């Protein structure tokens, strides 16, 4: 009995223990299904329970794994705390486990209202920061685009022309582009008492037309107009020498009428439509030309000529220009005319520049003996300036700005950019002898040397300077024009066989046409070497103001 009763008691205890165990598991499952019991369970695990179960650690540490194993848990969280906006959904899903545990620890099992402020406080700054990071770059970008577009628009617009008269606005010389039916200034204005002084104004210059500034195909009417203007200006120069205004005006009118008549004859000699005024006759023709004249006051100026003026004052041509295939001829052919200015300030910097120029000219002389060797001149230029920079840097003063560069193409480019005379033409002045003016005589009466492939040109200039430079300034131009005409008459008369006439000017009839041919082909561009040429006089040549007879020697032929 005792044994049986003990066995029954043990079985009863086991049954009770089994029943209690099943009830505990069911209660545990029910507690996990409710959010209130969930928070309480987490609270108990955090403070009173032994080491938390693996499932609870995964919730605290790895919420992504928990979301896979417990989908109802996150669904329940969304029901309790819905997101304020669709943009906040990823923020709440990421940060929910992080803010969940501290709130539960501090406030107890069910405190969703206290968790809401924390959730609302943290995400908005994060979203606001993202907006600040994205928006500011967009605004400067718009500003940059506006700044870049506006200058481009302004650069594309032509600036307003100045109100002052521009001599190059109506310039025909060297013109490029579309040509019209007439040259600028054609037909010329008819001489009258109103424009008499302007026509004979010594400072008034005119454009000489020829193949260099007129199209050679398809515009023969422009060539006829240019020839008429050339002949007209030649006649004007002759008439303006008359001392009486009455005789001068009568001469100008006859020259103008004769030029217009010859123009119409040339118009009818070709099978093209003639000028509309040429269809008339007599006074009606002249009145038509007078009415069609674009500038009856003769205020048109010629194209601005970019000339290198004579050296004024002691100026040192430093740094020298970079030798190139284009200027190597000037380097060699004009070397004997390049004189170093005198009376320079005795400063160390200028003396070092002068020493460099003197050394460079010596090297140029060696290179020119090799047949205008461009490579030799370039190496001499580079070596001379490198040596100059070595001396500059050896002194504790401010060296030349280009010497701050090391020996490199950058230094060479710096010196070449600062060269005042890159073509080595400092003392070369291009003169136009087609119209003798007081300014022209002022340039010819100075010390200089003429460079021309035509040997008769230096003789002409010497006759003009010897006989006219001693006269009063107002009379020099008239004297020079008379000497020019006399010299042309002499060349086409007794000395006709002493020189070659490539343009066949002497075959034309004397007076205006012949003189115009000389002006166009021989006297338009004459190079004059200005300054002191004393060092070059011992080479078998004399300057225009030194010597007594510069006429071409009989029998001397020149190309």
From Swiss-Prot:
Sugar-modified residues: 373, 463, 535
Q: Which UniProt keywords apply?
A: Angiogenesis, Biomineralization, Extracellular matrix, Glycoprotein, Mineral balance, Osteogenesis, Phosphoprotein, Repeat, Secreted, Signal
**GO molecular function terms attached to this record:** interleukin-2 receptor binding; protease binding
Q: Which Pfam families match?
A: ECM1
Instruction: Using the record's annotations, give every residue carrying the modification Phosphoserine.
Output: 556
Q: Which GO terms describe its cellular component?
A: collagen-containing extracellular matrix; extracellular space
Q: Which residues form a coiled coil?
A: none
Signal peptide position in this chain? 1-19
Query: What tissues has this protein been observed in?
Result: Expressed in the surrounding connective tissues of developing long bones, but not in the cartilage. The long isoform is expressed in a number of tissues including liver, heart and lungs. The short isoform is expressed in skin and cartilage-containing tissues such as tail and front paw. No expression is found in brain.
List the subcellular locations: Secreted, Extracellular space, Extracellular matrix
- Would the keyword Ribosomal protein be found if you checked this record's keyword annotation? no
Biological process, per Gene Ontology: angiogenesis; biomineral tissue development; chondrocyte development; endochondral bone growth; inflammatory response; negative regulation of bone mineralization; negative regulation of cytokine-mediated signaling pathway; negative regulation of peptidase activity
Q: Where are the sequence repeats?
A: 170-298, 302-424
**Start and end residues of each stretch annotated as 2 X approximate repeats:** 170-424
**Where do the segments described as Disordered lie?**
535-559
The subunit field of the Swiss-Prot or TrEMBL record says:
Interacts (via C-terminus) with HSPG2 (via C-terminus). Interacts with EFEMP1/FBLN3 and LAMB3. Interacts with MMP9.
Entry function: Involved in endochondral bone formation as negative regulator of bone mineralization. Stimulates the proliferation of endothelial cells and promotes angiogenesis. Inhibits MMP9 proteolytic activity.
**Protein name from the UniProt record:** Extracellular matrix protein 1
Species of origin reads Mus musculus
């Amino acid at each position: 009995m005792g044994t049986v009763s003990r066995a029954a008691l043990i079985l009863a205890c086991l049954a009770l223990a089994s029943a209690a165990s099943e009830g505990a598991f069911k209660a545990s499952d029910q507690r996990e299904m409710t959010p209130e019991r969930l928070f309480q369970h987490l609270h108990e695990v955090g403070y009173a329970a032994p080491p938390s179960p693996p499932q609870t650690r995964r919730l605290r540490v790895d919420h992504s794994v928990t979301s896979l194993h417990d989908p109802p848990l996150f669904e329940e969280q969304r029901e309790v705390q819905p997101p304020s906006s669709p943009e906040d959904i990823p923020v709440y899903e990421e940060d929910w486990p992080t803010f969940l545990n501290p709130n539960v620890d501090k406030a107890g099992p069910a405190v969703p209202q206290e968790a809401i402020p924390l959730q609302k406080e943290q995400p908005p700054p994060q979203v606001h920061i993202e907006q600040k990071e994205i928006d500011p770059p967009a605004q400067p970008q718009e500003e940059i685009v506006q700044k870049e577009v506006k200058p481009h628009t302004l650069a594309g617009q032509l600036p307003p022309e100045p109100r002052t008269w521009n001599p190059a606005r109506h310039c025909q010389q060297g013109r490029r582009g579309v040509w019209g039916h007439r040259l600028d200034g054609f037909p010329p204005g008819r001489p009258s008492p109103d424009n008499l002084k302007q026509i004979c104004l010594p400072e008034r210059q005119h454009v000489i037309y020829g193949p260099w500034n007129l199209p050679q195909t398809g515009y023969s009417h422009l060539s006829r107009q240019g020839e008429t203007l050339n002949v007209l200006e030649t006649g004007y120069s002759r008439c303006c020498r008359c001392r009486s205004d009455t005789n001068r005006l009568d001469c100008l009118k006859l020259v103008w009428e004769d030029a217009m008549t010859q123009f119409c004859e040339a118009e009818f000699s070709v099978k093209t439509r003639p000028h509309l005024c040429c269809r008339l006759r007599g006074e009606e023709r002249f009145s038509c030309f007078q009415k069609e004249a674009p500038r009856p006051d003769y205020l048109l100026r010629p194209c601005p000529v970019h000339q290198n003026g004579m050296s004024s004052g002691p100026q040192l041509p430093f740094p020298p220009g970079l030798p190139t295939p284009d200027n190597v001829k000037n380097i060699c052919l004009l070397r004997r005319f390049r004189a170093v200015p005198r009376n320079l300030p005795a400063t160390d910097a200028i003396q070092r520049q002068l020493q460099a120029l003197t050394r460079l000219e010596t090297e140029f002389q060696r290179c020119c003996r090799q047949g205008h060797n461009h490579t030799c001149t370039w190496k001499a230029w580079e070596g001379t300036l490198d040596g100059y920079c070595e001396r500059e840097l050896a002194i504790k003063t401010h060296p030349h700005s280009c010497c701050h560069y090391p020996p490199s193409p950058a230094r060479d480019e710096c010196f070449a950019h600062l060269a005042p005379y890159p073509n080595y033409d400092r003392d070369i002045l291009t003169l136009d002898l087609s119209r003798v003016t007081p300014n022209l005589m002022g340039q010819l009466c100075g010390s200089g040397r003429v460079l021309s492939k035509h040997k008769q040109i230096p003789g002409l200039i010497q006759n003009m300077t010897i006989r006219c430079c001693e006269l009063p300034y107002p009379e020099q131009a008239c004297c020079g024009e008379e000497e020019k005409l006399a010299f042309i008459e002499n060349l086409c008369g007794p000395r006709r066989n002493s020189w070659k006439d490539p343009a066949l000017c002497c075959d034309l009839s004397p007076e205006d046409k012949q003189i115009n041919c000389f002006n166009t082909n021989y006297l338009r561009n004459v190079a004059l070497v200005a300054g002191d040429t004393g060092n070059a006089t011992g080479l078998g040549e004399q300057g225009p103001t030194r010597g007594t007879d510069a006429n071409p020697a009989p029998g001397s032929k020149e190309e």
